[in-house]
Amino acid sequence: MAEEAHGQEISLRVPGEMAYALVIRTALGGVAILKDLDVDQMDDLRAAADEACDCLLHQGRAVSAVQVKVKDGGSSLTVSLEAEYFGPRDTSCAVQTDVSRAVLETLIPRVALHCAEDGCVCRIDLTLLKAA
């Protein structure tokens, strides 16, 4: 994990396997502490990261890696998780996407799912407002 001194952006790239969601959860727990999120926000962020990984890794396409970027916006923190897909899509992803969106929106105030041309989610942005 590397932090840029000027942009306050943190990034992490892990293999595209669900086992590495634990690495993402652990890293985001550390980021939450560094960025002064409260315990509830940290728990919600970590749970949302699990759900986002599950969504990205079950889009009917093979995933080589998941890229996580954290951007500190001062009063907010945005975590983007993006799948690096390869190969053709095997199945429809609409059902998984709807379920994931519903779960994510119960955990995080602002959620954006970005789809590739084939309709599968390729990036999920999670934005939390920092406690004052």
Question: Which residues does each PLM region occupy?
Answer:
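Long, contiguous hydrophobic alpha-helical segments, chiefly transmembrane helices and signal peptides
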Residues: V31, A49-C53, L104
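Bergerat-fold GHKL ATPase/HATPase_c domain
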Residues: M1-A47, T91
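Conserved ATP-binding N-box helix of the HATPase_c
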Residues: D38-V63
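Conserved beta-strand-loop-beta-strand hairpin that lines the nucleotide-binding pocket
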Residues: M1-S11, C55-A132
